[in-house]
């Protein structure tokens, strides 16, 4: 068969205007994103640094919005210059927002208020208030006072866009108690809510008397994950815990009595009492031992990734079947590299069941498949590898002995040698189906970085974008690629934060040539 020609962007736009893709909304959306991907990756397209700003407080990014001053000020990243969407009133240090999640309206749901159909920011303040804020105006739409018996600090999705978990800081006890060798029985609390409108699932305490040498706990997809100092990780059904150990059902806005005090649930100063207290160790759904409690689940069918619980095994990853703990064929992955920084591995966020393994000079995309003639066993194989652009060179060290003899020694450089191109960040842009890879090279005194876009299916390099600012490898960096936007957030010493915004533009040089030709 002959090679299939791809329709160019102009032809696809013309066909869309004539209604060729109008049979369902999904087709139109995919067509639009296909057109945008073609524009992003074409050779003439450039990404220009349109503005840069600096701040003394952390900078956050969520879906086209940049947040400054602990989420108090919101700026659009779409405009070619900073355009303020809103600024909330100044507040005291105790009222500042410490963590936030962006909530977006579910498709097809009937909601109680017109404002509910617009995006909201779910925010946690330093003084334990949970807020729902309009992402458009900054207006506070809902507020809940959590409690005074602990300090809540972290927000995460249990079920994305449906259920949130609010996690407290760990209770270390007083300095005097620590010196005496005693510690409080409750390590931390987890408050769980359904969103829009807020409704309480429950507040759970993680008690050392039940979980013994517990070091941390979190909630994800209805699973309570408990980590222990021995490296053990145990998974429990959160729903089963709620059904067995909930002491009383609490509803926000309703009267409640607790410990001789009466108040309204979710209002200050009463807050929300802890109403889920585990008294006996529940049966775990699953348990495994892993170095530093590192544990991930993913793939089709379900597999998990761990590092054997021995220090000398650091950098060795085992991929095992969840159903019977059997090691996949070729399931031991170890990147042969000599570097100061560890390589890392995770399940691909594109829901393909693949695995991404990142080292200083290579990005391996691995696939999980059935073993031929044995459907009960699965194997790991390479799908593709992205290599850093490097010279194969060795350092010659010359030593002169006491007798005057010259001795040459060849010493191989580290794989994350700063003078060689090194991978620092790997991410996935789901709408355009592109892998984005940040590579950094130290040139003289400063580092230079570029962001590369690779085909998610084959790993082919489609586009490379140089970042104009220098890249110091000792600083903390975040890079976001969102449709036609690239955002680089950098944290420098002394809590100085910088934000560099790049937008997709046509090459001005090519525009001038086109004008000259037309004249």
From Swiss-Prot:
Record flagged with keyword Nucleotide-binding: no
Main location: membrane
GO biological-process terms attached to the record: acrosome assembly; cell morphogenesis; protein ubiquitination; spermatogenesis
Keywords: Membrane, Nucleus, Transmembrane, Transmembrane helix, Ubl conjugation pathway
Pathway(s) served: Protein modification; protein ubiquitination
One Gene Ontology term, aspect cellular component: nucleolus
Subcellular location(s) per record: Membrane; Nucleus, Nucleolus
Presence of the UniProt keyword Transmembrane helix in the record: yes
TM spans (from-to): 186-206, 222-242
Pfam families reported for this sequence: DCAF17
Tissue occurrence: Ubiquitously expressed in the embryo, with higher expression in brain, liver and skin tissues.
Membrane topology: Multi-pass membrane protein
Free-text function comment from the UniProt entry: May function as a substrate receptor for CUL4-DDB1 E3 ubiquitin-protein ligase complex.
Subunit structure: Interacts with DDB1, CUL4A and CUL4B.
Protein name: DDB1- and CUL4-associated factor 17
Gene: Dcaf17
């Amino acid at each position: 068969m002959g090679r299939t020609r791809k329709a160019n962007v102009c032809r696809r736009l013309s066909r869309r205007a004539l209604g060729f893709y109008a049979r369902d909304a999904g087709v139109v959306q995919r067509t639009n994103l296909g057109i945008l991907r073609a524009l992003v990756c074409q050779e003439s397209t450039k990404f220009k640094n349109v503005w840069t700003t600096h701040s003394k407080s952390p900078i956050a990014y969520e879906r086209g919005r940049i947040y400054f001053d602990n989420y108090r000020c919101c700026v659009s990243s779409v405009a070619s210059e900073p355009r303020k969407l809103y600024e909330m009133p100044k507040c005291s240090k105790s009222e500042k927002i410490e963590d936030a999640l962006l909530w977006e309206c579910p498709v097809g749901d009937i909601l109680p208020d017109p404002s509910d159909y617009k995006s909201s920011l779910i925010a946690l303040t330093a003084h334990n208030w949970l807020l729902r804020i309009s992402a458009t105006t900054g207006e506070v739409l809902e507020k809940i006072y959590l409690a005074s018996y602990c300090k809540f600090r972290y927000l995460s999705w249990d079920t994305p866009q449906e259920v949130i978990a609010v996690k407290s800081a760990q209770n270390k006890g007083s300095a005097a108690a620590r010196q005496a060798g005693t510690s409080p029985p409750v390590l931390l609390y987890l408050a769980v809510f359904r969103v829009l409108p807020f409704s309480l699932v429950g507040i759970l305490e993680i008690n050392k008397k039940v979980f013994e040498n517990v070091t941390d706990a979190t909630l994800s997809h209805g699973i309570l994950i408990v980590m222990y100092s021995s490296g053990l990780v145990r998974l429990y059904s959160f729903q089963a815990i709620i059904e067995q150990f909930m002491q009383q059902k609490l509803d926000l806005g309703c009267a409640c009595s607790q410990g001789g005090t009466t108040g309204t649930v979710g209002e200050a100063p009463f807050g929300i009492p802890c109403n889920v207290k585990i008294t006996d160790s529940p049966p775990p759904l699953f348990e495994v031992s892993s170095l530093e409690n590192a544990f991930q689940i993913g793939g089709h069918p379900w597999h998990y990734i761990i590092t054997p619980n021995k220090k000398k095994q650091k950098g060795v990853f085992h991929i095992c079947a969840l159903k019977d703990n059997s090691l996949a064929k070729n399931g031991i992955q170890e990147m042969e590299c000599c570097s100061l920084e560890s390589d890392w591995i995770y399940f691909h966020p594109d829901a393909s069941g693949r695995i991404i393994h990142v080292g200083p000079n290579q990005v391996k995309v691995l696939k999980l498949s059935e073993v031929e003639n044995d459907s009960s066993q699965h194997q790991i194989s390479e799908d593709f590898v992205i290599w850093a652009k490097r010279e194969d060179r060795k350092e010659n060290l010359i030593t002169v002995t006491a007798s005057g003899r010259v001795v040459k020694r060849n010493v191989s450089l580290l794989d994350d040698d700063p003078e060689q191109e090194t991978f620092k960040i790997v991410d996935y842009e789901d709408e355009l189906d592109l892998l984005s890879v940040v590579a950094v090279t130290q040139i003289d005194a400063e580092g230079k970085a570029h962001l590369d876009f690779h085909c998610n299916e084959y790993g082919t390099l489609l586009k490379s974008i140089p970042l104009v600012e220098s890249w110091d490898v000792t600083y903390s960096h975040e890079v976001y690629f969102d449709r036609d936007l690239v955002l680089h957030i950098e944290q420098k010493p002394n809590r100085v934060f910088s934000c560099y915004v790049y937008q997709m533009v046509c090459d001005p040089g090519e525009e001038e040539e086109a004008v000259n030709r037309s004249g």
